[in-house]
Regions:
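An active-site-proximal "capping" alpha-helix that borders the catalytic cofactor pocket
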Residues: 35, 73-88
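Short alpha-helical hairpin
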Residues: 1-18
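Short, well-structured alpha-helical segments
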Residues: 29, 33, 54, 93-104, ...
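Divalent metal-dependent phosphate-bond-processing catalytic cores, especially two-metal-ion Mg2+/Mn2+ enzymes
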Residues: 2-4, 22-47, 59, 110-186
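Short coil-to-beta-strand
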Residues: 4-9, 48-56
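His-Asp-centered metal-binding catalytic motifs of divalent-metal-dependent phosphohydrolases/nucleases
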Residues: 50-68, 74-78, 99-107
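Short amphipathic alpha-helical interaction patches enriched in hydrophobic/aromatic residues
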Residues: 17-21, 43, 62-67, 86, ...
C-alpha cells in the first residue's frame, strides 16, 4: 500500500479544499474523506485493489476543488491532474491508468460503463457518501438555498434517493440498512 501517496493526497486535498477559490467550500473535503472511507470498505467487501480504490477516491473530485471552471468535465480534468501527481511519485503506469479509469467513470450523472470492480467501488462510494453528510445537505438546503422545513426535507430526501439509485445492485444490498435508517428519520 502506497501510504506515502495516500498521506500526501489527504493533505493536498485538504489544502485545495481550504482555499477561498474553492467554490464548494471546506465541506467538499469531508465529502471526499467520506468517499475514501466508503471506497476502502467496498474494496475490502468486493475484493478490489484497495490501493487503486483509495487513491482514486481521494483524487476523484480534485479538478472541481482546484478550479470551478473545470466542474462540468471534472472527471476528465481530474484524471489528467491525477496522472501528473502520481507520476511525481513514480507510480506505475499501469496503476495510473487504473486510477484514471476510476476517476473518468465515477460520476453517477454520466452513464459511463464501470467495467472494473475498482471503478464500481469508487462510483458507489461517491454516491453513498451523501448518507454520511446529511447535516451538510441540510445546511445546503436551509442556509444556502433558504428553503423552508418541508422544501429542505424534500430536497435532502430526493438527493439521497438519487444517490442510492446510482449504486450498483451489490452496493444497494450492502447499504440498504443505511438507506432505510436515513429515510426513517427524514
Amino acid at each position: 500500500m502506497r501510504t506515502d501517496i495516500i498521506n500526501y493526497l489527504k493533505n493536498e486535498i485538504y489544502e485545495r479544499a481550504s482555499k477561498p477559490s474553492n467554490k464548494f467550500g471546506i465541506g467538499c473535503y469531508y465529502h471526499i474523506e467520506a468517499v475514501a472511507k466508503n471506497a476502502e470498505i467496498l474494496a475490502k467487501k468486493f475484493e478490489a485493489d484497495e490501493e487503486i480504490v483509495i487513491i482514486s477516491a481521494w483524487l476523484h473530485d480534485i479538478a472541481s476543488i482546484t478550479d470551478y471552471s473545470l466542474y462540468e468535465l471534472h472527471h476528465i480534468h481530474g484524471a489528467n491532474i491525477a496522472e501528473n501527481i502520481l507520476k511525481q511519485f513514480n507510480y506505475e503506469e499501469k496503476k495510473i491508468n487504473k486510477v484514471k479509469e476510476c476517476i473518468l467513470n465515477h460520476r453517477g450523472s454520466i452513464n459511463n460503463a464501470k467495467l472494473s470492480i475498482e471503478e464500481k467501488c469508487v462510483a458507489d462510494a461517491d454516491a453513498i457518501s451523501h448518507f454520511d453528510s446529511i447535516p451538510s445537505l441540510m445546511y445546503l438546503a436551509y442556509v444556502n438555498k433558504h428553503m423552508n422545513i418541508d422544501e429542505g426535507r424534500n430536497f435532502v430526501v430526493e438527493k439521497l434517493k438519487r444517490s442510492y439509485n446510482k449504486l450498483s445492485d451489490s452496493s444497494k444490498e450492502f447499504y440498504k440498512d443505511k438507506y432505510d435508517n436515513a429515510m426513517s428519520v427524514l
